[in-house]
Amino acid sequence: MKFTQRLSLRVRLTLIFLILASVTWLLSSFVAWKQTTDNVDELFDTQLMLFAKRLSTLDLNEINAADRMAQTPNRLKHGHVDDDALTFAIFTHDGRMVLNDGDNGEDIPYSYQREGFADGQLVGEDDPWRFVWMTSPDGKYRIVVGQEWEYREDMALAIVAGQLIPWLVALPIMLIIMMVLLGRELAPLNKLALALRMRDPDSEKPLNATGVPSEVRPLVESLNQLFARTHAMMVRERRFTSDAAHELRSPLTALKVQTEVAQLSDDDPQARKKALLQLHSGIDRATRLVDQLLTLSRLDSLDNLQDVAEIPLEDLLQSSVMDIYHTAQQAKIDVRLTLNAHSIKRTGQPLLLSLLVRNLLDNAVRYSPQGSVVDVTLNADNFIVRDNGPGVTPEALARIGERFYRPPGQTATGSGLGLSIVQRIAKLHGMNVEFGNAEQGGFEAKVSW
């Protein structure tokens, strides 16, 4: 198997064709041999019987047997006569030979019991013969006509060889033609291989499928789809890296400034304490940003979900509200959960769906004023997270969900990645996320399925 795998496709196809053609030729030869021998036996048996009947119609009483047997048949001047093709002898009932062909007929042993076709041998020989025995109409004579089996086999072999040898001779010609045609048909594959070998790693240009066999076209189309996905991934990663570098630069610069302020505030404990508090807050913001960047990067690399389960959304929302409750209380914000539907379940990855709800709640609490309420409502086909904040302008609403985008004028800290993470998780679960301003004021996010 390893040897054949190292061979080219053209050589392998040629070997397969050669093996199949050889096996087919051998099977055809066997079938042709069987059919031909059966037909030859039937034909020559009929010939023997007709010749014996013809001899039985002779007036054997008037034949001068001595003179007849003395006259050995002459060879034809032109052509070939096989002495094994046919022989005969005529006996009386007591076994006395009265007539033969002057050749092999002299050695035919007499048998008074045989009638019809029988196999036997000549006197003093081991070669098998085919005989037909017949009694003359007057009952006085026994007529036997024989033919050597080897003659029949030679005749059958000559017929079969005449039919099959031309095909055997044509096989090398067919192989040459096949190799030429295979080389011609595989030329598009060689061209495709060259295009892949010379392809720029950053190229997004699809492979040309012109002239490619239909059996290989799905491979080319799959490669083009792979190249498109790879290019999109590379563009996404480059954009992500660029945005991440830009977003990390500001908090890191701020951390450096606060560190320098703390170092220069040895004589002012109050300023030093304030700088350290701001440094701690900056570290928290940077940590949150890095966590969100890593989360978004992992989500981008997912094409399908693993470890999915049936998740009761009622339990999911209740646990998420409990998780955010302490933070909301510190900000003097009340979080309320309203269940307009029960026993609603969705198939998904528990940790990711929990992250989706937590990000929506965190965003609502972060941008809501003190003393306001965040409402979480579960319906039969969606759930809604609504705050009492100022909402967003139509221009900003159109860009909500873009990575690193934050509406202008925001005082609350943030990275602009939370809602991007929400959209990505929802997409992985086949859900739809809609952002908008609530009719009674505030910003709302609706997750529907």
From Swiss-Prot:
Residues 34-156 are periplasmic. It is an enzyme of class 2 (transferase). It catalyses: ATP + protein L-histidine = ADP + protein N-phospho-L-histidine. Residues 1-12, 178-449 are cytoplasmic. It is a multi-pass membrane protein. GO terms for molecular function: ATP binding; phosphorelay sensor kinase activity; small molecule binding. One of its GO terms (biological process) is regulation of cell motility. One of its GO terms (cellular component) is plasma membrane. Residues 243-449 form the Histidine kinase domain. The chain crosses the membrane at residues 13-33, 157-177. It holds the Pfam family HisKA. Induction: By the signal autoinducer AI-2, through MqsR. It is found in: Cell inner membrane. This is Sensor protein QseC. Member of a two-component regulatory system QseB/QseC. Activates the flagella regulon by activating transcription of FlhDC. May activate QseB by phosphorylation. InterPro entries: 2CSK_N, HATPase_C_sf, His_kinase_dom, HisK_dim/P_dom, HisK_dim/P_sf, Sig_transdc_His_kin-like_C, TCS_sensor_his_kinase. Disulfide bonds: none annotated.
